[in-house]
């Protein structure tokens, strides 16, 4: 009697990589493999790596090393897989290495070392939406792969290639399957969400296709309109500040997609932005933010910035602080510039000393924490829609429309009414308190 082969799986990195992991796991289950959470009984281990910054590379190499030590049969995929020589130098015993989104190659290698079972007992158990690594009530939906930008601090295009948008009908079909399976929130991800379909010819962008019996065009605005028809929360991430992003704001004001924009601005000094190869018209950005908020007063703006970029002077940094004060962003992440092997910025002159980076990082965070706290304080006394993530003996933990999972704050809810609630449910919460990150309230 043959036994079902076991595959161990390690997923590292960002939400885009998580989606790749879900795709591979779905194919493994469809082919009849059993997925297990341990090295000990695995016939083979797959490590889906990250290679964005040096610390991520180190984490990936350590994970590969642990898998080799504990199991011995390891296949590597993901972003770091694009640098096969670097992996082989450290771990020559790895069986096979593939780059990111190489699903077919991964499965081919799995079949080579662990033949698929003759009798597949799992096919009927694979859900229509595929295997998901997120809680049942939210899911990441990747709409494109790769990036056409060449930001000097980033090596993603060298690992994931140029922009490659998925067909709009394929994206919408997956979104509908997720919604039909009980997903209440879709998190739209890619390397550059606002570039969706721009890699296609004008003819293809304007070509009429049909979905749900209706004619649609192949572009981001149409995609968001159709996603908004599913009756669930739709949250946009990684939105590069193209001019047509302005056209998304009315959809948010109308309630078709969440009034939430994750738009990585990276800096505010024109000189630094030019060195980064990022858009540098910061005054125009402030004008757009003002206009967006006029159209959609409930808009939440999230952004990320880099301090200590090569050549950043105290004057440049002060421009960044001044921008924070004027823009009054709701949610902000800050990173100290980290040299990445292969990135143009790593070889630039005028590298900023680590102690200066650290000092600027703390000054940045002090300013933004004060701004964030003040903006959250404005929500005290209001009633917000909150999606429930957890329920325990201490109460409810959820998120408002302004909070993406894992990167933003949460809402702690005291269920004074003792109403029956469940994870994934959207409830009305009266906000009673706030700090610089989180909210507290009652229902």
UniProtKB/Swiss-Prot annotation:
Domain spans labelled TRAM: 377-443
Binding-site residues for [4Fe-4S] cluster 2, renumbered to this chain: 147, 151, 154
Domain of life: Bacteria
InterPro entries (alphabetical): Elp3/MiaA/NifB-like_rSAM, Methylthiotransferase, Methylthiotransferase_CS, Methylthiotransferase_N, Methylthiotransferase_N_sf, NA-bd_OB-fold, Ribosomal_uS12_MeSTrfase_RimO, rSAM
Chief place of localization: cytoplasm
All copies of domain Radical SAM core, residue ranges: 133-374
Subcellular location: Cytoplasm
Positions of disulphide bridges: none
Names of the cofactor(s): [4Fe-4S] cluster
Gene Ontology process terms (BP): tRNA modification
Class of enzymatic activity (EC top level): transferase
Cofactor binding notes: Binds 2 [4Fe-4S] clusters. One cluster is coordinated with 3 cysteines and an exchangeable S-adenosyl-L-methionine.
Reaction(s) this enzyme catalyzes, per UniProt: L-aspartate(89)-[ribosomal protein uS12]-hydrogen + (sulfur carrier)-SH + AH2 + 2 S-adenosyl-L-methionine = 3-methylsulfanyl-L-aspartate(89)-[ribosomal protein uS12]-hydrogen + (sulfur carrier)-H + 5'-deoxyadenosine + L-methionine + A + S-adenosyl-L-homocysteine + 2 H(+)
Function noted in UniProt: Catalyzes the methylthiolation of an aspartic acid residue of ribosomal protein uS12.
PANTHER family in the record: RIBOSOMAL PROTEIN S12 METHYLTHIOTRANSFERASE RIMO, RIBOSOMAL PROTEIN US12 METHYLTHIOTRANSFERASE RIMO
Name the record gives this protein: Ribosomal protein uS12 methylthiotransferase RimO
Gene giving rise to this polypeptide: rimO
């Amino acid at each position: 009697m043959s036994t079902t082969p076991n595959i161990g799986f390690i997923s590292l990195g960002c939400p885009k990589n998580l989606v790749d992991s879900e795709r591979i796991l779905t194919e493994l289950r469809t082919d009849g493999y059993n997925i297990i959470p341990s090295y000990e009984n695995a016939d083979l281990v797959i490590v889906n790596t990250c290679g964005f910054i040096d610390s991520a590379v180190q984490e990936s190499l350590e994970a590969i090393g642990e898998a080799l030590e504990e199991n011995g049969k390891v296949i590597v995929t993901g972003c770091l897989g694009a640098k096969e020589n670097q992996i082989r130098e450290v771990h020559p015993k790895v069986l096979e290495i593939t780059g990111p989104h190489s699903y077919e190659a991964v499965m081919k290698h799995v079949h080579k070392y662990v033949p698929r079972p003759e009798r597949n007992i799992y096919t009927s158990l694979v859900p229509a939406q595929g295997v998901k690594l997120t809680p049942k009530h939210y899911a990441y939906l990747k709409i494109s792969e790769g990036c056409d930008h060449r930001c000097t601090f980033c090596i993603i295009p060298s690992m994931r290639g140029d922009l490659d948008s998925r067909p709009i009908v394929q994206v919408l079909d997956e979104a509908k399957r997720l919604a039909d399976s009980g997903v209440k929130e879709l998190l739209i991800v890619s390397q550059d969400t606002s570039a969706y379909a721009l890699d296609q010819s004008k003819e293809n962008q304007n070509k009429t296709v049909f979905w749900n019996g209706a004619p649609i065009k192949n572009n981001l605005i149409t995609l968001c309109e159709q996603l908004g028809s599913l009756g669930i929360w739709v949250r946009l991430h990684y939105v590069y500040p193209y001019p047509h992003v302005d056209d998304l704001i009315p959809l948010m004001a109308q309630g078709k997609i969440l009034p939430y924009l994750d738009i990585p601005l990276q800096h505010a000094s024109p000189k630094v932005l030019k060195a980064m190869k990022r858009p540098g018209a910061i005054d125009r950005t402030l004008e757009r933010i003002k206009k967006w908020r006029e159209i959609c007063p409930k808009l939440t703006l999230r952004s990320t910035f880099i301090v200590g970029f090569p050549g950043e002077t105290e004057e440049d940094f002060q421009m960044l602080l001044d921008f924070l004060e004027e823009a009054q962003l709701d949610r902000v992440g800050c990173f100290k510039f980290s040299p990445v092997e292969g990135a143009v910025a790593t070889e630039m002159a005028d590298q900023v000393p680590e102690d200066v980076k650290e000092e600027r990082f703390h000054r940045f965070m002090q300013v933004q924490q004060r701004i964030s706290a003040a903006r959250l304080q404005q929500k005290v006394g209001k009633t917000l829609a909150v999606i429930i993530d957890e329920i325990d003996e201490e109460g409810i933990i959820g998120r408002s429309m302004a909070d993406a999972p894992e990167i933003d704050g949460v809402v702690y809810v005291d269920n004074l009414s003792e109403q029956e609630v469940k994870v994934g449910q959207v409830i009305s919460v009266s906000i009673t308190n706030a700090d610089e990150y989180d909210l507290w309230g009652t229902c």
